[in-house]
């Protein structure tokens, strides 16, 4: 099965021609957008030797610059990762994203979202994670044990599969419904105790790229009130 057979398919009432016109800035360079999603997904996984080497040698920056140039994306943030010892990436990841230092920034969607019939949040494995497990089952995929089903790296990877499958309706719907929390992740990262310069930079980069992507897909930005509610759900300590 393809990702487009997953649950919660987008409303297809709009004509195909209308949707293609709306998504054309992404449609025309879908392979490059897919590659950018994969690049960022790999960067936001637990750091491994390949990622550490790519940061240290400049390979990651070179790939990022090439894709951003191809996609004609203009960002205020530098495309050069901050200097950080590659040996410290694992500690930085755990400090910033997994709560070894408080406050921290949960890198999964559920904590920022309302918990089923209540507005409270702050917990892992909420409705977003349950939906993602359904989506993975629909494509005969499994969630890696080390990650929440709605971890940002897995969401990016799933988005890349939608682009690869060529279903831009599903891609647009998924971008709208599963990445609205990125501004809250950025705010939580700003307030986190960990230094983690590379991962702080990656979170800002991701958030700014999705501002561009929403604009090209004509999706609305999350409101300030929405972001504040999301931050309130994770609490002062992440």
Where are these regions (language model features)?
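Charged, alpha-helix-forming regions
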Residues: 2-238
């Amino acid at each position: 099965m393809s990702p487009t057979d997953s649950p919660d398919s987008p409303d297809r009432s709009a004509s195909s021609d209308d949707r293609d016109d709306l998504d054309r800035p992404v449609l025309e360079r879908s392979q490059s957008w897919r590659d950018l999603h994969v690049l960022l997904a790999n960067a936001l996984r637990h750091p491994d030797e390949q990622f550490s080497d790519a940061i240290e040698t400049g390979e990651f920056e070179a790939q990022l610059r090439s894709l951003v140039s191809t996609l004609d994306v203009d960002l205020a943030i530098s495309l050069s990762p901050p200097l950080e010892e590659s040996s410290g990436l694992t500690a930085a990841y755990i400090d910033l994203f997994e709560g070894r230092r408080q406050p921290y920034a949960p890198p999964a969607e559920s904590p920022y979202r309302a918990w089923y019939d209540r507005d409270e949040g702050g917990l892992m494995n909420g409705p977003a994670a349950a939906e993602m497990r359904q989506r993975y089952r629909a494509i005969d995929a499994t969630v890696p044990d080390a990650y929440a089903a709605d971890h940002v790296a897995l969401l990016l990877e799933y988005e890349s599969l939608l682009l690869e499958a060529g279903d831009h309706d599903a891609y647009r719907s998924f971008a709208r419904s599963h990445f609205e929390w990125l501004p809250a992740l950025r705010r939580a990262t700003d307030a986190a105790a960990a230094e983690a310069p590379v991962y702080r930079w990656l979170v800002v980069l991701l958030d700014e790229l999705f501002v561009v992507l929403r604009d090209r897909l004509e999706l609305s930005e999350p409101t300030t009130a929405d972001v504040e509610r999301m931050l309130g759900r994770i609490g002062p300590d992440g």
